[in-house]
């Protein structure tokens, strides 16, 4: 403020001196300076003085703006830094709420730097979730050491021969957890499932887990089998009950395909596209099976084929070591005649597992792509006949192929033996007449134009 006043006085001094001089010289004015001679009257000189005053005032205003420019720029930078710091703080709180420890610590450090508060990162780190600490049991050596110091030293033992001092070493063998269920437990569970006693089967699983006869993985799979088998039964009094049981089966074992397929088919039949696609994205990392894509195919029939290709390529990237995602992406690329993309995905699938559908698609690419080789197409046709069949519902006990999953195999009555897997060529003779033709041909999600 003082600087502005000094500048204003400097600019106003000539005006004040000129005004005093003009008050002493009324009428015409003559100005002589360094040989220059100017004759004028009072109005003209007053106008000149006014112009000079306006120029000095503008210069004063400009100098004030220039002087305030660094402070304004600094305040603007501080405001931007404060805004970024608050955004990083909110992101750190969101990461803490979602349980993402890595992102939470990164945003907390950024917020502490931008807000110039070193203690903020430590306070936010205390909000992040931490795994529960495992109780550390005292070792045998520590327990023995405590007992040693608790006792008073007694008299020394009498001397004995060295041979008598050697004690036999006894190694205690710890009871290992069973690798799989025993035959008795398997028969007990199978009997309840065959009889349709779903509630009794669930109760028996809980008792077996408490008794230590079942591992958590086996218990989760058997619980999911019982719930999905119960969901497949007709419930005329409660139409929503099968879907509810299927969702419970999914929650019990996320790696079990039948309940996930059950729920996705229900969402597709109701036309709930967003729910079905969300469920597919959550299930695909655990069970990337082609049958899930076949179930969602009605939702994508009217969509752009390029959009479908992008979706399937994203699914293939989620499970890059499973062939079904690459096969579906290759088939979608074949439908829009993107030969390079189709070759890349199909060859990735064939490197993982030889498949008849993949060989057939490669033969068609060689036949339709400009510059393709007829000889290569013939080679792929021969490999198609030599490759394994496409995945199907196969009973692991009797090697029969069935049309749909069931808790009990309709052929051998095996419980929890039907899985979605690739069947070998030799089992074609074991197929029932109704399923032989259907299992040899894989449904196509896309048709080339």
Swiss-Prot record:
Loss of function: phenotype: Normal magnetic response, fewer, larger magnetosomes; cells accumulate 20% more iron. Deletion of the 4 gene operon (mms6, mmsF, mms36 and mms48) gives an intermediate magnetic response with fewer, smaller magnetosomes in irregular pseudo-chains.
Major localisation: membrane
Segments passing through the bilayer: 40-60
Keywords, sorted A to Z: Biomineralization, Magnetosome, Membrane, Signal, TPR repeat, Transmembrane, Transmembrane helix
Signal peptide location: 1-18
One Pfam family from the record: HemY_N
Membrane topology: Single-pass membrane protein
Location(s), subcellular: Magnetosome membrane
UniProt KW Signal keyword: yes
TPR repeats mapped onto the chain: 323-356
Gene Ontology CC annotation, any one: magnetosome membrane
Induction: Part of the probable mms6 operon.
Recorded coiled-coil stretches: none
Biological role stated in the UniProt entry: Overexpression in wild-type cells increases the number of cells with double magnetosome chains significantly. The 4 genes of this operon collectively influence magnetosome size and number.
Additional record remark: This bacteria makes up to 60 cubo-octahedral magnetosomes of about 45 nm in diameter which contain membrane-bound crystals of magnetite (Fe(3)O(4)).
Name assigned to this protein: Probable magnetosome protein Mms48
UniProt source species: Magnetospirillum gryphiswaldense (strain DSM 6361 / JCM 21280 / NBRC 15271 / MSR-1)
Gene name for this UniProt entry: mms48
